[in-house]
UniProtKB/Swiss-Prot annotation:
Gene3D superfamilies for this protein: 1.10.20.140, P-loop containing nucleotide triphosphate hydrolases
Protein name: tRNA dimethylallyltransferase 1
Cofactors: Mg(2+)
Function: Catalyzes the transfer of a dimethylallyl group onto the adenine at position 37 in tRNAs that read codons beginning with uridine, leading to the formation of N6-(dimethylallyl)adenosine (i(6)A).
Length: 328
């Protein structure tokens, strides 16, 4: 059985910096001292469970790890897809299932880290068995989305599968179409195809969630968005637009990118950046709230309120204890 650490936190909660502090090679001696384990086994590799960091050319808006963080701690599934390509939960589970045993064979701990709840939940429980995609049905709904807009399809979805429609955003065209596909093929709503009740038995999971007070999390979101603009987020989006990517590209439907485009899919002018920034902050806060709500539905989660130094110490010790499984 392969031990896997799931490291979850809402956007802007500080996952990347905390993971770098805990798992990087430069801190391995501290791990050895704290947990009574060798420096060699006190190393991990990160599997990014972030649906935006998977895309190339989107470093700033996705808050991807810095060059120094990537050099110090191995990361996987970062910048592996073009913004025009889809990357689904099934794709993530397939890739993570290959990576976890490989990392474990190297004597390291696989750490799934991110905030894309859909990725993590499907990896934890396994994918629900849904009807195979029918290319003709998919093409039909893709054509309708292009001609009528995904908003029309989402409104229709509310009538046949309100549970799925409730958790989808109008920009999530891929999943809106998939929900229609499933209903058209089976006559059943996608929400009726439930995940298995228990976590997959091929892994031994340690699930942790880093948490902050809502007010401080929102403050961090405000500061991070400001920092992204200062770092050159507009130029990053402009370059993507010049490369031929638009708000219809899967990668650019993400929060932090879609707000830069008007209703005609044109890039907004620099004079609108104040409004764009406000939209990104608002949408990111709403997303963070949904992330927190979602993760409360997962049982057996170890929660750490990292504004308290004692909680960070407890987190550190708990991870060290889980690391010992590598030596068995």
């Amino acid at each position: 059985m392969v031990p896997v650490l799931i490291f979850f936190g809402a956007t802007a909660s500080g996952k990347t910096s905390l993971a770098s502090e805990i798992f990087s090679y430069k801190h391995s001696k501290d791990f050895s001292k704290e947990g009574g384990i060798s420096a060699l086994s006190a190393c991990a590799e990160i599997i990014s469970a972030d649906s935006v960091q998977v895309y190339k050319h989107m470093h700033i808006g996705s808050a991807s790890p810095s060059k120094e963080e990537l050099e110090d701690l191995p990361h996987h599934l970062i910048a592996i897809k073009e913004p025009s390509e889809e990357f689904s939960a099934a794709d993530f589970v397939k890739e993570a299932d290959k990576l976890c045993p490989e990392i474990y064979r190297r004597g390291k701990l696989p750490v799934l880290m991110g905030g894309t709840a859909f990725f993590l939940k499907n990896f934890l429980y396994g994918l629900p068995v849904t009807p195979t995609a029918d290319p003709k049905i998919r093409e039909h709904f893709q054509k309708r989305a292009k001609e009528e807009g995904a908003g029309i399809l989402l409104e229709e979805l509310k009538k046949i599968d309100p549970e799925t429609a409730e958790r989808l955003h109008v920009h999530d065209e891929y999943r809106i179409i998939r929900a229609h596909e499933v209903f058209a093929a089976s006559g059943k709503p996608l929400s009726s195809f439930a995940l298995p009740e228990n976590p997959r038995e091929k892994y031994e999971f340690f699930i942790l969630s880093i948490e902050r007070t809502r007010s401080l999390l929102y403050e961090r979101i405000e500061k991070r968005v400001d920092a992204m603009f200062a770092e050159g987020l507009y130029d990053e989006v402009k370059k993507l637009y010049e490369m031929g990517y638009t708000s219809e590209s899967p990668g650019l439907k993400a929060i932090g990118y879609r707000e830069f485009f008007d209703e005609n899919k044109r890039l907004k002018p620099e004079s609108d950046l104040e409004e764009v920034s406000a939209l990104i902050k608002r949408n990111t806060k709403h997303y963070a709230k949904r992330q927190e709500t979602f993760f409360k539905t997962i049982p057996d989660v170890h929660r750490y309120f990292i504004e308290d130094k004692a909680e960070i110490s407890r987190l550190y010790k708990d991870i060290c204890g889980f690391y010992k499984k590598l030596l068995k």
